[in-house]
C-alpha cells in the first residue's frame, strides 16, 4: 500500500525492520493484527483504528516508528514498547508516554508509589507524585501519565539489566502543547527547568522542536544517563556537591556525553533525534505553551530517523590495572 490507499487488516501483518510502510488510513479488524518491528516504520496520513478490542493486536516494537501526517483522532488502544538496556537496581530513567491513559503501576509494577517523580520548576527539585499523608497518588489522582509531553523520573526495581517499558493506550497524535512553567521574577540559574518528553509513538527532531519554540526555550536538552552509580545523586539530591555529571547534553553545536570519574566509559552522545518514550529537561525563557508540531519532514517534528539513543544507557566497564609505586 501507499499513502493514497485505505488499509484494512483482517489477518496478521508484520512490518519488518527494513520496511517503510504507508497508508492513507488503517483499520485493524477482528482476526487481524499488526506489528511494526524494530527499525521498521509506518506512515499514516489520517486515522488509525484498532477495532479488535485488544492492544496486543497492534504493536509498535522498540525502535520502530509509527508516524501520522494529519491532526486526526485515533481510536482503540495499541501497544508501544521501549527497551532500556543496562538497567541497575534503584536507578532512574526519564520517561514520557506515547499513548493516552497509561497508568504508572502497570508500566512499572515493582516501583513503589513514592518513587514516581515529577519535576517542580518553582523550587528546582523533584517531587514524588505520591501524597505522603495518604500513601496514594494524591498529587496525580488518576495514577497515570497525566498529559502528553510531560516527563517523569521513574526508579527501577527489577533484577534484570534489560527493562522493556510497555505502553498501552490510544496513540498520541496531532499538535500537542505542554505548559512550560517559569517562576515569576526568577533570575537564578536554577529556575526555568521543565521535564518534558517525546509525546509520540515515533522519534522526534529536537532542533525542529526548538526552532518552533525559540522564543520560549533555549536550544539545549538534558538527558539523564545513570552513568555515575551514586545513590546520593538520585532524585532531588542531584548533584549533591559532586563534581561528576549524569546528564548528556544536546545544544545547537552538537551533543556531549555525560562524564564520569568511575571505571566506566562516557555515555552515548545525544543527537537531535529523540527516541520514543524518552523524557528530558529543557530550560524555559518564559512561561508559555511548548508546541509539539505533528507531521513528518518539513511540516512537523516527527521522524523515523533512528540514529539517536535512548537514555538510560550506560557505558561499558573499562578494565584497568592499578599500580602502586613504593620507594626502595
Say what each PLM segment does.
Residues 265, 269, 273-281:
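C-terminus-biased signal that marks the final domain/tail of proteins
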Residues 122-141, 164-180, 184-186, 225-269, ...:
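Surface-exposed intrinsically disordered loops and tails
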Residues 110-125:
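Flexible "stalk/tail and boundary" regions
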Residues 13-16, 41-44, 65-70, 125-127, ...:
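Short, surface-exposed beta-strand/loop "edge" segments at domain boundaries and coil↔beta transitions
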Residues 41-112, 137-222, 274, 281-328:
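A short, polar beta-strand/turn micro-motif
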Residues 2-40, 47-58:
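Beta-strand repeat architectures
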Residues 5-9, 26, 150-154, 280-281:
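Short hydrophobic/aromatic-rich beta-strand motifs
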Amino acid at each position: 500500500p501507499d499513502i493514497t490507499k485505505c488499509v484494512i487488516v483482517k489477518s496478521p501483518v508484520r512490518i519488518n525492520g527494513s520496511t517503510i510502510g504507508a497508508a492513507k488510513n488503517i483499520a485493524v479488524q477482528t482476526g487481524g493484527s499488526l506489528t511494526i518491528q524494530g527499525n521498521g516504520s509506518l506512515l499514516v496520513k489520517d486515522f488509525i483504528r484498532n477495532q479488535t478490542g485488544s492492544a496486543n493486536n497492534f504493536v509498535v516494537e522498540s525502535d520502530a516508528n509509527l508516524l501520522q501526517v494529519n491532526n486526526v483522532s485515533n481510536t482503540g488502544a495499541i501497544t508501544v514498547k521501549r527497551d532500556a538496556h543496562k538497567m541497575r537496581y534503584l536507578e532512574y530513567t526519564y520517561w514520557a508516554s506515547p499513548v493516552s491513559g497509561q497508568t504508572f503501576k502497570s508500566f512499572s509494577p515493582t516501583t513503589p508509589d513514592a518513587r514516581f517523580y515529577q519535576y517542580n520548576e518553582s523550587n528546582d527539585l523533584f517531587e514524588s507524585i505520591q501524597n505522603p499523608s495518604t500513601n496514594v497518588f494524591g498529587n496525580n489522582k488518576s495514577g497515570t501519565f497525566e498529559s502528553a509531553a510531560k516527563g517523569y523520573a521513574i526508579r527501577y526495581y527489577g533484577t534484570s539489566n534489560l527493562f522493556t517499558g510497555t505502553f498501552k493506550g490510544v496513540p498520541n497524535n496531532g499538535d500537542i502543547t505542554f505548559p512550560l512553567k517559569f517562576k515569576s521574577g526568577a533570575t537564578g540559574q536554577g529556575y526555568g527547568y521543565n521535564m518534558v518528553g517525546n509525546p509520540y509513538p515515533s522519534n522526534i527532531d529536537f532542533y525542529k522542536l526548538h526552532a518552533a519554540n525559540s522564543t520560549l526555550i533555549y536550544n539545549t536538552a538534558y538527558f539523564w544517563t545513570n552513568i555515575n552509580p551514586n545513590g546520593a545523586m538520585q532524585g532531588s539530591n542531584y548533584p549533591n556537591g559532586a563534581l561528576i555529571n549524569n546528564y548528556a547534553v544536546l545544544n545547537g553545536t552538537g551533543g556531549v556525553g555525560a562524564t564520569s570519574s568511575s571505571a566506566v566509559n562516557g555515555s552515548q552522545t545525544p543527537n537531535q533525534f529523540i527516541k520514543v518514550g524518552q523524557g528530558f529537561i529543557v530550560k524555559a525563557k518564559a512561561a508559555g505553551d511548548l508546541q509539539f508540531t505533528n507531521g513528518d519532514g518539513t511540516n512537523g517534528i516527527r521522524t523515523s530517523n533512528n540514529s539517536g539513543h535512548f537514555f538510560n544507557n550506560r557505558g561499558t566497564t573499562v578494565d584497568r590495572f592499578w599500580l602502586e609505586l613504593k620507594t626502595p
